[in-house]
Amino acid sequence: MQQAELIERIKELKIKRNAVILAHYYSRPEVQDIADFVGDSLGLSQEAVRQTADVIVFCGVHFMGESAAILCPDKTVLLPEIDATCPMADMVDIEGLRREKEKHPNAVVVCYVNSSAAIKAESYICCTSANAVEVVNSLEAEKVIFVPDKNLAAYVESRTDKKIIPWEGHCPTHHQILREDVLKMKEKHPEAKFIAHPECRPEVLELADHIASTRGMIMYAKNSPAKEFIIGTECGLLHGLHKAAPEKKYYCVSEFACCPSMKMVNLEKVLVSLEKVQHVVTVPYNVRTRAKEALDRMLAVKIR
């Protein structure tokens, strides 16, 4: 089936199923283009709650579909590629987290949304890269166990007076962006501003002109007087940047900054998920209710 036919069929089935398509900025360009809403993790969570559709097709990795299912238990959430998992989410386990909580009984667990529903259920509050600092600063506790990303934990620690106890996880895609990569690109494009995602290594963030979530990076590039930008995150964001400010130039900091899991979802899989209503995301009730409390606490935090 040609791409134009795929798109038309997807549109027909969206109407038939009363479905909405949500996609992360790291998705394939053609998937972003057929989505009703494209955003970062915080924006996608907020949009899922706002939706009145019966079916949510979530073009992303498994934890994203789980979050939508937790927040919208009355909706059918479909994940076009059920094997699209997040390596970082798999770096934290329940038993290990429980041991850490026992070691630090006065600490509050802040869970980055890039984690499983079970880990969210073991946490007090969730956060995204867009609101992590505000979430941590909203807490009364002075100690925070931050899971699973040590790089985001380090970024938050540099912007709070709280004691951060980091979990030893990381995003492989962001972690392999090196300081040397940035310096080479800066030498090649001396007029370009370097904007970076807080999942990057601390030594990479030290070189950044601006640090933000994916949506924050788009807004910065759009509103900045600069005309060129080196992008320190997954390469899929370039599509959103070009759409937001097509007159500007963008350079991916590394050719290796590509998440294989996020690229697993394609138009064919979106179509099949709508045709067969397959890969429905389910979360056990006892996990869902506790995880929802952590997500709801996050959504209640006001950000700048």
From Swiss-Prot:
Essential cofactor(s) = [4Fe-4S] cluster
Main subcellular localization, coarse class? cytoplasm
Q: Kindly indicate where the leader peptide sits in this chain.
A: none
Instruction: Offer a single GO CC term for the protein.
Output: cytoplasm
The entry's free-text remark on the cofactor is: Binds 1 [4Fe-4S] cluster per subunit.
Positions of iminosuccinate binding: H24, S41, Y112, V113, N114, S129, H197, P198, E199, T214
Q: Give the Gene Ontology MF terms in alphabetical order.
A: 4 iron, 4 sulfur cluster binding; metal ion binding; quinolinate synthetase A activity
Pfam family for this entry, one: NadA
Swiss-Prot/TrEMBL catalytic activity? iminosuccinate + dihydroxyacetone phosphate = quinolinate + phosphate + 2 H2O + H(+)
Q: Which processes are annotated in GO (biological process)?
A: 'de novo' NAD biosynthetic process from L-aspartate
Keyword 4Fe-4S recorded: yes
Which compartment or compartments is the protein found in? Cytoplasm
For [4Fe-4S] cluster, which residues are the binding ones?
C86, C171, C259
Q: Which UniProt keywords apply?
A: 4Fe-4S, Cytoplasm, Iron, Iron-sulfur, Metal-binding, Pyridine nucleotide biosynthesis, Transferase
E.C. code = 2.5.1.72
Task: Kindly tell me the pathway this chain contributes to.
Answer: Cofactor biosynthesis; NAD(+) biosynthesis; quinolinate from iminoaspartate: step 1/1
Function statement: Catalyzes the condensation of iminoaspartate with dihydroxyacetone phosphate to form quinolinate.
Q: Which family does it belong to?
A: Belongs to the quinolinate synthase family. Type 2 subfamily.
Name of this chain's protein: Quinolinate synthase
Give the species. Answer: Methanosarcina barkeri (strain Fusaro / DSM 804)
